Amino acid sequence: MKIGFIGLGIMGRPMALNLLKGDHEVTVWARRAESMHPLLDAGAKGAGSPADAAQGNELVISMVADAPDVAEVMRGVAQGAVPGLVAVDMSTIAPAAARRIGAELAAAGVDFMDAPVSGGEVGAIAGTLSIMAGGSDAAFARAKPAFECMGKNIVHVGASGAGQVAKAANQIVTGMGVLAVAEAFAFAAKNGVDRGKVREALLGGFAYSKILENHGQRMLDRNFKPGFKSWMHEKDLNIVMQTAHELGLCLPGSAATAQMFNAMVGSGLGEEDSIAVLKLLERLSGQA
């Protein structure tokens, strides 16, 4: 399949590389030309613009930071689109924004899917991402061979915007989960109990989770190297809260978690991994 790929950051670069490994013909574009070099070295073609990335391709994928970026690149995609093109955005944006962008592309004759992912940099590199897709059955069928190169758990959640709803729900669970593990560790340490032993005990019971297993170990190792930056999780939780406000939905746990991530960014931890919420808790409780 001929695929254009736009956005080559922490997530986009390994995702595009996995498409190349799957024997797809990949054309890449990124705002920073140097981001394209690893893909060009691996056999991808370079594009001069989003429109150029769309031209002559069957599928175009974007993996960028936020809704304005998605809207901008998709306007370019529409300019370079050929009949039958499917455009897939795998970024995390608000469901309402995904629906709006989808409607704009439909007016230009482009079928659009929102297909955000979960699994972080590790999953992107391994090709084991969870992919949550929203859009038509026909678009999903066209995009699925590409999805299978990038992920293992691939779910067509529903119509346009449904993928972003699922991703927002994912961010609620993961945000609270990371905060819960960090609070448990802060609680243990303040009581003079070894955090590693507490984690070991919890892993054998009903408190087990992948977050406790994987991120808990990284907290113990003080490894805050970003696989998913705190400012990005803050952005995602703000999407949750904005959508909840629009719907008149009460989400007290999400609200508290969002405030913690807002505080992380405000205190200079935005470029570190989301598990650096442990650092914030340590500062607030006199453990730093």
Task: For the regions a language model picked out, list residue spans one by one.
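Rossmann-fold NAD(P) dinucleotide-binding segment
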Residues: 50-111
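Active-site-proximal catalytic alpha-helix in oxidoreductases
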Residues: 126-134, 155, 159-191, 203-214, ...
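Rossmann-fold dinucleotide-binding core
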Residues: 92-175
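NAD(P)-dependent dehydrogenase/reductase Rossmann-like domain
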Residues: 266-288
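Interdomain hinge/lid region at the active-site interface
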Residues: 160, 208-274
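Residues in the short beta-alpha loop(s) of Rossmann-like NAD(P)-binding domains
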Residues: 31-32, 66, 136
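NAD(P)+-binding Rossmann beta1-loop-alpha1 motif at the extreme N-terminus of oxidoreductases
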Residues: 1-62, 85, 121
